[in-house]
Amino acid sequence: MKTLLLTLVVVTIVCLALGYTLTCLICPEKYCNKVHTCLNGEKICFKKYDQRKLLGKRYIRGCADTCPVRKPREIVECCSTDKCNH
């Protein structure tokens, strides 16, 4: 009986892990509520914005397999839970 229970627990965990897909916010505005389902292998949500004083902040949000590299005058934030890139 214990073996059957353990087998069911392992199968459940494997099935849940295989079926999980990350969701991230994806829009160019400061306040965002558009949700995007990431592709298989994309395990990171990110938000990038630059600090140009005259033009204001320009936001880029999305999914990635790794955290994007920061460019000069750019801030990059990465996280790995659903809709964490607000």
Curated annotation (Swiss-Prot):
Tissue specificity remark: Expressed by the venom gland.
Species this chain originates from: Naja atra (Chinese cobra)
Keyword Ribonucleoprotein: no
Disulfide bonds: C24-C45, C27-C32, C38-C63, C67-C78, C79-C84
InterPro entries: Snake_3FTx (IPR003571), Snake_toxin-like_sf (IPR045860), Snake_toxin_con_site (IPR018354), Toxin_cobra-type (IPR054131)
Lineage: Eukaryota, Metazoa, Chordata, Craniata, Vertebrata
Function, in words: Binds with low affinity and weakly inhibits muscle nicotinic acetylcholine receptor (nAChR).
Protein name stated in the entry: Long neurotoxin homolog
Secreted is among the record's keywords: yes
